């Protein structure tokens, strides 16, 4: 086993160069931080670990194959709580990525493909309540994205829902009152407002309506009294 004592602050695992090192177990002290793993054919191989300063508690556990991140990436806080769990393939995030807030509450849950967001993405606030739910394709919003209300104790309803096509607004875009009724509604094509747009009162009756063409209002904006029938 190779051991070294180096006076330095913190050294991330991925900055360590092992190309000139012999095969076998590697262990190195960077000041008060211990980093260790295996070397095979001059490359990182298997699980590499970086501890928290002055402890034997892991901060990072990163799996390698031929010097590239492959498999699970794990990050822990000083109390040994898991705060990140990420799947890697060929040095890129590929699969699921999770993160947690202090106390173990979920902070994010996202799907990746070849290093880019691709699939479902859910973001939570520091209380563990959902604040954003999205779909992605090749790193761009794709499909429905919904934002939610919340307070310190309870999960609230959705208040915004947008439809995307490869990062651009496409289709109906809506906002909502706290009781779930539609507040505004507008149609988009290729990121430009096109078609009918409505604003509603809390009771669901139409407050105003108009029509957009290429991002501009065409014709008159019609306004209505609360409860008035069209």
Regions found by a protein language model. Give the residues of each.
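Periodic aromatic/glycine/histidine/acidic cluster detector
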Residues: 10-125, 129-201, 205-230
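Sec-dependent signal peptide recognition
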Residues: 1-2
């Amino acid at each position: 086993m190779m051991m070294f004592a180096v006076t330095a602050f913190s050294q991330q695992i991925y900055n360590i160069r092992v190309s000139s090192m012999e095969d076998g177990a590697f262990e190195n002290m960077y000041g008060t931080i211990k980093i260790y793993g295996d070397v095979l054919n001059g490359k990182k191989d298997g699980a590499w670990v970086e501890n928290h300063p002055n402890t034997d508690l892991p901060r990072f556990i990163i799996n390698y194959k031929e010097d590239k991140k492959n498999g699970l990436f794990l990050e822990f806080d000083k109390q040994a709580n898991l705060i990140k769990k990420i799947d890697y393939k060929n040095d890129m995030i590929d699969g699921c990525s999770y993160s947690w807030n202090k106390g173990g509450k979920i902070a994010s849950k996202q799907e990746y493909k070849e290093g880019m967001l691709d699939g479902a993405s859910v973001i939570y606030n520091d209380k563990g309540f959902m604040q954003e739910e999205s779909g992605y394709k090749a790193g761009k919003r794709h499909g429905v994205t919904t934002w939610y209300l919340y307070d310190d104790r309870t999960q609230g309803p959705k208040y915004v829902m947008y439809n995307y096509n490869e990062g651009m607004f496409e289709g109906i875009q809506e906002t909502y009152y706290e009781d779930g009724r539609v507040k505004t509604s507008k149609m988009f094509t290729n990121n430009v407002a096109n078609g009918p747009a409505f604003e509603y009162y809390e009771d669901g009756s139409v407050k105003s309506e108009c029509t957009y063409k290429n991002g501009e209002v065409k014709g008159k904006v019609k306004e209505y009294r609360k409860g008035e029938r069209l």
